[in-house]
Each structure stands twice: as C-alpha cells, then as structure tokens.
Amino acid sequence: MLHFIQKVSGASSKMLKNPFTVRLGAGRIDILSLKTCLLQNFSSLPPRTWLSPSFQVCMRKIQCYHVSPCNFKKQKAVLPPKKRSTITYLLDSPKPALYITLAGLIPFTAPPLLMVITKSYIPVLAFTQMAYGAGFLAFLGGIRWGFVLPESSPAKPDYINLASSMSPILFSWAAILFSERLNEAIVTLIIGLGIALHNELFLLPHYPNWFKALRIVSTLVAFISFVVTLILENIYPEKGPKRPD
C-alpha cells in the first residue's frame, strides 16, 4: 500500500511539471497529457500489487459468477388441449347403436310432419306420438338400472343410481294418466326427458361419451317434435278422432 502511495505522489509531481494545455481559441482544456501521464505511471506497477489482499479475494469471487443477458421476451403460456364437446362423440358411436337410435326417432318426427303435409291437426297422430314418448322415457330408466348391474360397472347399485332410474318411469306413468288431456301429457313427457338428460350428464356421469351424445340428440329431436305438435294444434284445424278406436 505504501508503494502505491509513493507512485501516486510521483505521478502528482509529474503532473505539476506538465501543466494542462489550454486552447484559447476553442475555450476548453486538453487533458491528453494528464491521461498519458497516468498511464505511464500505473503501467509500471506489477499486476495487482497495489490491491489489498481482501480486495483481491473479493475480485476472485466476483469472477466466478457468470452474467448473461436476461431474456425479457414474453414466453407464450402452454395451454392445455381443449376438451372436446360431448356432441362431437356422436360419430364415435357403434354403428348399430347409432342407426337404431336414429330409426327410433321416426315416431317422434313423423306425426308433426304428416300434419304439416296435410295442413291439419290430427289428434290420433298426436296421441301416438305421446304414447311412444312415454314408452321411450320409461326405456331410459331401464337403461340406468341395467347399467349398474354388472360387477365391473363404474356405477354401483346404490340408492342414488337406482332411485334415479325410477324417475323417468314415474313421468311416463303420469303422462299416461293425463292422456285424456293430451297437451298436459306431452308437457309432462318434455319435463321428464329434460330431467333424465340432466341426471345422466351431470349427476350420474358414468355413461360413455358416445352414449351421452346419442342421448342429447334424441332428447333434442323429441323435444322439438313435441313442441311442433303443440304449435300445430293452434294453427291447423282439427281433423279425425281424438283417440284410436
């Protein structure tokens, strides 16, 4: 450290002997001679002899760190794959189940279609549509009962599963009781179909996705067919008996 002070004092004395060059025309001080003098004096020092030992140790530790430029670009978040909608599994259905389900929708759609063609409201066709809807709704309850019977089934034969399978049957029974008042019977079936679909999709989600897709399609077709029948009663004139002989 003493050697460093001596060198600095020697440099200061040399700086006094070599004064700054003043450029009067430019109005500024030329410090080139000062830089040259300092470089000559400090270059003659042995490397790092003028540093204290503690400072040298600190410098060695600092040199161990690697500093790289930070990447401030926003990286795109990796989003999870979008879940498929239940209705998209319709084409994954087994062909026999798909074709039989589509054929089973004909009794729902045929009566209002014939009424539109003949431009008349036919109570017999509306009654047959209602009777088929009652049987269809009871069949949905039986599906749930049969689904819980196998030992390997994910749905267990507990009170929730077995009791939920009875609700479609009760709505079917009520619709048959109201068959004298056809409109009330059709509304009862619409409510029963909606409750059954809600239970199967949200409360009892054990069915395969393709079966859920079939249930959505069949319920929508039945609902639209029943609503069209109720509308046609108020549009077209009534024709034929109210019930089959």
Curated annotation (Swiss-Prot):
Which spans are transmembrane here?
97-117, 122-142, 159-179, 185-205, 216-236
Q: Which organism is it from?
A: Mus musculus
Q: Which domain of life is it from?
A: Eukaryota
Q: Which UniProt keywords apply?
A: Membrane, Transmembrane, Transmembrane helix
Task: Give membrane topology per the record.
Answer: Multi-pass membrane protein
Q: Name one GO cellular component term.
A: membrane
The lineage is: Eukaryota, Metazoa, Chordata, Craniata, Vertebrata
Q: What is this protein called?
A: Transmembrane protein 69
Annotated compartments: Membrane
